[in-house]
Amino acid sequence: MSERKYFGTDGVRGRVGQFPITPEFAVKLGWAAGRVLAAKGTSRVLVGKDTRVSGYMLESALEAGLAAAGVGVDFLGPMPTPGIAYLTRTFRAAAGIVISASHNPYYDNGIKFFADNGHKLPDAVELEIERLLDEPMDCVISEELGRAKRINDAAGRYIEFCKSVFPNEMTLEGLHIVVDCAHGATYHIAPNVLRELGAEVTEIGTQPNGLNINKECGATHLTALQNKVLETKADLGIALDGDGDRIMMVTENGRPIDGDEILYMLAVTAQNQGQLQGGVVGTLMTNFALEKELDKRRIPFVRAKVGDRYVIEELVKRDWYLGGENSGHVINRQHHTTGDGIIAGLQVLAAMYQEQKSLEKLSCDFHKLPQVLINVRFESDKQPLESENVKSVVREVESALAGTGRVLLRKSGTEPLIRVMVEGENEAKVKAFAQQIANEVEAATN
């Protein structure tokens, strides 16, 4: 298959005002996507966004390009990424377009696509869009131009969908939950879902101003949530990222719970309830402790490439339901086609109800191996992973670990970073090994 030129592992992403996140490129991308969709005989797409100020500019540019290709647009306004995937299916739209850079700062943005079935676009379709991006843009005749309108009840529809996955016989009454929405796309949704299911809710990160998304809050910055949980003596905390597809949690004692621990709790509870179908899919970054703990319980476990799209592909291939990443993407195909932070949180709350345990007790049997991740920035034309010095130091560290840990080096699919991950039983040694490799990677970028 051809190499992608514009699309990364999660659509097109970058700094606003710098190629490819410019109004000119967004118009062309809308047109190219519209041409591909129009060729399939479909004429409407949904467009949603997170709360970045640049979202208004990009949605207007996309709409212009789509209209020129003869494709109409239904605007959803601020909407979590998984909400856009869900509504794309229920509205029988040709595609859903998400304007978001997920957990990145406000000055970044991105554009990604869902197919009509709520899954990420197949590689072949993305490549066809890329091919058209390199062709001159044209415009349909006036009678065939796409038209735009807004869907005013989109948030309410998604709230009801989220509530529908929480079993009717259960309630959140008696639970005090702090929810941090990262000043992002879930700000008007997650607190309402939890309240309508009976919880007492304290909300933070729910005052977006276009520039504060993910700023010292949300799933990538847990300190604010930890402090609020302890201050209010809440039962637990839930942190979502800017577009709502990632979740982290905090116990009543302020202890952070990541995606690996959430997968462990959900898998074990599903097994106890006789509801686990097949096994669990993680990624190359999944903590080795999860693999070992699931093996003890005879729950199959496989690793996919990093990226929720690859986890989903592996789940579909094996007809399993449960998978995710330590970063907080958690997928349950029984409920949704993509990772959904709100739904993953509701599943954990349901597990607490079923097991009659607090979040602290539900997660206390799982002990992660020390894992250190160092990001090394590099110029896009460099190839540090091909360096013989880097390969040599990796072999040296793997030999020293002697099968009690792992080393993983990989390029980020969304940023110009090399991710250096080392895992093992001794935290001090793991830190030293990771720094040793990172230093060599950095030297190879100069």
From Swiss-Prot:
GO BP: carbohydrate metabolic process; peptidoglycan biosynthetic process; UDP-N-acetylglucosamine biosynthetic process
- Pfam families to which the protein is assigned, alphabetical: PGM_PMM_I, PGM_PMM_II, PGM_PMM_III, PGM_PMM_IV
Q: Could you say which cofactors this protein requires?
A: Mg(2+)
Q: What is its EC number?
A: 5.4.2.10
Described function: Catalyzes the conversion of glucosamine-6-phosphate to glucosamine-1-phosphate.
Identification of the protein by name = Phosphoglucosamine mutase
**Comment on bound cofactor:** Binds 1 Mg(2+) ion per subunit.
Which catalysed reactions does the entry list for this protein? alpha-D-glucosamine 1-phosphate = D-glucosamine 6-phosphate
Q: A GO CC term? A: cytosol
Q: How is it modified after translation?
A: Activated by phosphorylation.
Q: Which InterPro entries match?
A: A-D-PHexomutase_a/b/a-I (IPR005844), A-D-PHexomutase_a/b/a-I/II/III (IPR016055), A-D-PHexomutase_a/b/a-II (IPR005845), A-D-PHexomutase_a/b/a-III (IPR005846), A-D-PHexomutase_C (IPR005843), A-D-PHexomutase_C_sf (IPR036900), A-D-PHexomutase_CS (IPR016066), Alpha-D-phosphohexomutase_SF (IPR005841)
What are the record keywords, sorted? Answer: Isomerase, Magnesium, Metal-binding, Phosphoprotein
Question: What is stated as this protein's family in its record?
Answer: Belongs to the phosphohexose mutase family.
